[in-house]
Amino acid sequence: MIKTFADKRTQELYVTGKAGRFPPDIVKRALRKLEQINAATALSDLRVPPSNRLHALGRDREGQHSISVNDQWRICFLFEDGEAFDVEVCDYH
């Protein structure tokens, strides 16, 4: 379950479905991925589908994981005890 968001843009997207400043072509897929994170009870739940490309992050995002929205955009988050924190749709590359 998503407990917190890292930014207001991601929270608004999830709560209202409005794109805000996100590119329109990622909105539908990002919402679907956010729902997957919300439904996950274990980090391993996010390994399926393989297109999520779930992986741990390093450097300044140590402790976070991410799943792919597309080739450019990711959803980054902390996952502890079946809950997601600091969820953020981002282009960190």
Residue ranges of model-derived segments:
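Arg/Lys-rich, positively charged N-terminal/basic patches that mediate binding to nucleic acids
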Residues: 1-33
